Amino acid sequence: MWLKPEFGSYVMTAKNMENDTSGQLLADLFDEYSEWYMGLAAEYGSLPRSLSGLSKEGRQFIYLLDDLELHHMMRNKYLRYILDELESVVYAYGGIDLRGDSDAAEVAEVLSVSAADSENYITGDWRVVRDEDGKVADLAHLGTRQGNDPEEHPGTWFMAGSVSFSALEKSRFGALWDEAKPGVIFRDRNGEG
């Protein structure tokens, strides 16, 4: 369904990444990833949980995570493993969360999209509106915020702080990653393949 998502018209190349500030790269990646999600909602009526990492050489991956069956703490560590393996300097993460008060029956689906590096983040939220068939009919923007404390906010902490992996974790995460690679989208943002 989402085999070859197309991004917006902005292309970040390795050359302008070297000259770009971290903040501008985050803003560009956030805008691009948000537009990608808007396109998925309009075209498919669905919003997958996903992670995209970008290396300083312009290599990018897009990993759809809906089929990943790991406890959320292990999933977070696994995602950090992938970002480290592919030498990502910035990443984008998106997916639907449930927010509100379940006791008061006031729970809403919210699409959260974040772009972050080890020191800064930008994150935005959209309320998900579904049609009678359960497909996404609209996304209502709730707000965008940014900051320099990514370790404090869900979805923005994957590159914050240092993380060590045991030999067993490296082996397990490496095997999971090898198994996932055929379904992961890879692209060179410099247009070289």
Please provide the spans of the model-predicted regions:
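Short, surface-exposed loop and linker segments with low hydrophobicity and enrichment for Pro/Ser/Thr
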Residues: 38-45, 96-114
